[in-house]
Regions:
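Topogenic membrane-insertion module of multi-pass membrane proteins
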Residues: 2-59, 109
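Alpha-helical linker/edge segments of TPR/alpha-solenoid repeat scaffolds
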Residues: 224, 292-306, 332-343, 370-380
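Membrane-embedded alpha-helical segments that form the functional core of polytopic membrane enzymes
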Residues: 48-68, 162-177
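Alpha-helical adaptor scaffolds
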Residues: 254, 258-260, 279-323, 327-328, ...
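Small-residue-rich helix-interface/hinge motifs
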Residues: 58-122
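Polar-ligand-bearing catalytic/cofactor-coordination segments
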Residues: 80, 115-124, 183-264, 270-276, ...
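Hydrophobic transmembrane alpha-helical segments that form the core helix bundle
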Residues: 122-219
Length: 380
């Protein structure tokens, strides 16, 4: 089973690489065509380099615009089917509804270019609308392709606008494909994979609803330990093969951490990580961080830490180096394992800097309690 899932993940990642290569190649051909129209005796090499740089920036701008269009699609179709706005993120820039007000915050998640999270409508007989919300981004990307393709026809081939609109078509089509076709892409499942999981399981629909409700309550300042207990009941092993349902295990272990029930949390995380659960790579990496932290403030065994801190985990922690729980884990390692107070103090300052911009104050409050736990261990 593990090898089968790995093959699926590898195939999905290969497809994403191929799609991005095709987008890059097609954009490159458009760039060459555009530059050829400006070559001549009066154009210097410096001017050609400048034009090339501006065109490359235009490709990046097209990708950014299509991310906005994609997340906007989730927002529009979510609102149309009874969801309410919770947060809207592009790259690390994020708008979040906080106590009824819209706030600007920063959040960076490896493997994601953006994210639109919404508060779900109430469940009715265990059901809720989810297809349009999940596919809304890809639908909007495809609609934009039609719009930009039509606009490109209004300008001559040598025009910058013709170039830019055609790049928008290429990027939009690529995004629609990579998000609409069910794929397990490295750290997270894409929209199509989520929709397929929901179609296959009624239990997954409830799990999806719980995830959205947890996010809604977190944005209102509530901690996991304060939320209804029945939201965090661990699904049976069969249900853990569904990526959305398996995420309830992540929430359940995080709630145990928030309650200070560390031994139970560690035992649950060990079980989840060693089993056949379909927990996405992003959350697996964060869960290993939690186990590292508990080991450091507990027995602090070198052999146990070595087993956790694999090359893959170190790479993950580097990619997620601004995330609060990762910084907290790095702080504990510096303070208690490396015995390096200066390094720990530097990490703590980084934590404070990123915490000030973090969208969920209740999570930062929980993180600070765990930081104090590490400090207390250092004093003993």
């Amino acid at each position: 089973m593990g090898k089968k899932k790995k093959r699926k993940g590898t195939g999905a990642q290969l497809l994403s690489i191929v799609v991005y290569l095709l987008i890059g190649a097609a954009s490159g051909l458009l760039i060459v065509r555009f530059i050829d129209n400006f070559t001549g005796p009066d154009v210097t090499i410096g001017q050609e380099i400048l034009i090339f740089a501006l065109l490359m920036l235009s490709v990046y701008a097209a990708m950014l615009l299509q991310i906005i269009i994609h997340e906007g699609g989730h927002l529009v179709f979510g609102l149309a089917t009874g969801y309410k706005f919770s947060s809207f993120r592009i790259l690390s820039w994020m708008f979040v509804r906080e106590n009824g007000k819209l706030r600007f915050r920063h959040l960076s998640l490896a493997g994601t270019g953006g994210q639109c999270l919404m508060a779900p409508p109430d469940l009715k007989d265990g059901a809720m609308p989810f297809l349009l919300y999940n596919f809304g981004g890809s639908i909007m990307n495809l609609c934009s392709c039609l719009l930009f393709g039509g606009l490109s026809l209004l300008f001559p081939r040598e025009s910058f606008f013709n170039f830019f609109f055609l790049v928008l078509v290429l990027v939009g089509a690529g995004f629609a494909l990579l998000n609409g076709v069910p794929l397990h892409l490295g750290q997270v499942d894409n929209d199509g994979a989520n929709a397929l999981s929901l179609l296959r399981s009624r239990e997954a629909v409830r799990a999806f609803w719980i995830q959205m409700k947890v996010n809604e309550q977190t944005s209102r300042g509530m901690r996991l330990s304060e939320m209804p207990e029945d939201w965090f009941v661990l699904p049976d092993e069969g249900a853990m093969n569904n990526g959305i349902t398996a995420y309830i295990g992540v929430l359940a272990s995080s709630r145990l951490m928030d309650q200070g029930r560390f031994e139970e949390a560690d035992a649950m995380m060990e079980k989840l990580l060693s089993g056949e659960s379909r927990i996405p790579g992003l959350h697996r990496g964060l869960m290993i961080c939690e186990r590292i932290f508990l080991e450091v403030v507990g027995k602090n065994r070198p052999e146990a830490l070595e087993s956790f801190l694999t090359g893959e985990q170190k790479k993950f922690m580097k990619a997620m180096r601004t995330f609060p729980s990762v910084l907290r884990t790095e702080y504990a390692l510096a303070l208690l394992t490396d015995k390096d107070p200066a390094k720990a103090e530097k990490i703590l300052k980084e934590f404070d800097r990123y915490a000030a911009k973090y969208p969920y104050p209740s999570e930062i409050a929980a993180e600070r309690e765990l930081l104090k736990l590490a400090e207390k261990q250092a004093e003993e």
